[in-house]
Amino acid sequence: MPGVYLDDNEYNFDIALRRFKKQVEKAGVLSEMKKRQHFEKPSVMRKKKKAAARKRLLKKMRKANMG
């Protein structure tokens, strides 16, 4: 779990909040929360994963053909 500790000479809340937000984003807490907000059947998860892989492949192929 991300956490921010303040130094003795650090009293600025905005800086601490910014550091905390950065740590939360880096840890992927919000995206994980959104993903787990509703139950998703394993078959739907597999379909989404397969579709994302196909999309990445097509994007990679388009990029290779263009440049």
Curated annotation (Swiss-Prot):
GO biological process terms on file: translation
Any GO molecular function: structural constituent of ribosome
Keywords linked to the UniProt accession: Ribonucleoprotein, Ribosomal protein
Cellular component annotations (GO), alphabetically ordered: ribonucleoprotein complex; ribosome
Coiled coil: none
InterPro entries according to UniProt: Ribosomal_bS21 (IPR001911), Ribosomal_bS21_CS (IPR018278), Ribosomal_bS21_sf (IPR038380)
Keyword Membrane attached: no
Pfam families in the record: Ribosomal_S21
NCBIfam families given in the database record: S21p (TIGR00030)
Similarity comment text for this entry: Belongs to the bacterial ribosomal protein bS21 family.
Name of the protein in question: Small ribosomal subunit protein bS21
Originating species: Oleidesulfovibrio alaskensis (strain ATCC BAA-1058 / DSM 17464 / G20)
